Every structure is written in C-alpha cells, then in structure tokens.
C-alpha cells in the first residue's frame, strides 16, 4: 500500500481528505481582510447614523416652532368647559352662580341644594380648602339675598 505525504495510505487519505484543513485555510491575511471589512462597514454605519441625527436636529428647531404655532390655533372646546380665571375682588351674581353651578335666577331651594352638595364635597373639616368654603358660603349668601322666595 502506498503512503501519502501525510503518512496515511492513499485510500485513507482520500477518505479523510475532507476533514483535513487545506494549506491556506484560516490564514491570518484572510482574517485581517474580513475584520477590516467589518470595521469599515461598522464605521460607515456609525457615520451615516451621525449625519442622520444631525439632519434631524436641524429640522426639529423650525418644525418645533411650526408645531407650537399650529397648536395655539387649534380651538379648545373641551378646555372651555372649565372656568378660566380666579375670583373677582367683589363677588357678583354671575360669579356666585358659577361657583354653585346654578343659574343666576335659580330658586332658593335649588341654591340651598347646590350649596349643600358642594359643601359636603369641600368641607374644611374633611380636608377641603377653608378659602374655597368661604367663597362657596359667600356665593350662597349673595344669591339668597338677591333671590325672591
């Protein structure tokens, strides 16, 4: 039986030839080329992301101003449900009726019922604001004094 350069017979060499590494498989130049290509691809990706981020930041400043201006132009019917503003220096019938949630021409019984309902929810002894309780009582007194029985 003839032996090959690997020290095996020719039939054994043919049998195991697919498992034996070739002379240049895994050489350092191939690894360096693959690593270099990968590093270049990663570098280009980082550079592209940086340029895209810079472009986005440049667009955001004027776009933010446009968005803010358009948001101011939008009508807010849902926000107009609540009364905007504080209390006036001297309470009038309109403000008193807004506080109690009744019409300015409501009867005394409706005013008392609304006052009772609001004071139960906002009594100072149960954690409510003393200032708000004072304003609620002032509104009740004003509406009752100007309303006919």
Swiss-Prot record:
Q: Which residues form the J domain?
A: 95-149
Q: Where in the cell is it found?
A: Mitochondrion inner membrane
The portions of this protein that span the membrane are 35-57
Q: Which GO terms describe its cellular component?
A: mitochondrial inner membrane
UniProt keywords (A-Z) are: Developmental protein, Membrane, Mitochondrion, Mitochondrion inner membrane, Protein transport, Translocation, Transmembrane, Transmembrane helix, Transport
Q: Which residues lie on this side of the membrane: Mitochondrial matrix?
A: 58-149
Cited SMART domains: DnaJ
Q: How is this protein situated with respect to the membrane?
A: Single-pass membrane protein
Question: Which parts of the chain does the record assign to the membrane side Mitochondrial intermembrane?
Answer: 1-34
PROSITE patterns the UniProt entry points to: DNAJ_2 (PS50076)
Matching entries from PANTHER family are given as: DNAJ HOMOLOG SUBFAMILY C MEMBER 15 (PTHR12763:SF7), PTHR12763
Q: What does this protein do?
A: Negative regulator of the mitochondrial respiratory chain. Plays a role in the translocation of proteins across the mitochondrial inner membrane. Involved in pronephric kidney development at the early tadpole stage.
Q: Would you tell me the protein name for this molecule? A: DnaJ homolog subfamily C member 15
Name the source organism: Xenopus tropicalis (Western clawed frog)
Question: Which gene codes for it?
Answer: dnajc15
